[in-house]
Amino acid sequence: MTQMYNSARSCPSRANLLTGLYPHQTGLGHMDGSHPAWPKGYSGFRSNSDNVTIAEVLKDAGYFTAMSGKWHLGNKSNPILRGFQEYYGLLGGFNSFWNPAVYTRLPKDRTPRHYEEGTFYATNVITDYAIDFIDQAHQEKKPLFLYLAYNAPHFPL
């Protein structure tokens, strides 16, 4: 990228990054969530096709597209519906770094990795899946687009 303008934080910035559009154009003009004190506005990444993601464009161009990490673009869509062929991560907002039950593997027919009790740490696991996706693209002999979105920068541990 030679130019990217970030006019919002968090969810709207993710929508901006994935589409190249301003957050209000993506349907996500404010932080996604259900907090009653938050102003009403644009809630949720539009799942219709008028805002194409970079993953959709690159998938159509023959890339292997994968995402590992935090989605948090509303519940109207998910990474698979928006051009990613493989996904592992947190679909919603902040949650535990140590509880594998709150993380999702998509498409749904994929078997998630198993971690012994006490060994799961989200940043490491998100990285493990990213490496798996790199290996998968290599095996399929396809160029790779990997969107890696760690949750760790959001809160102190």
Placement of each model-derived feature along the sequence:
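Formylglycine-dependent sulfatase
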Residues: 1-157
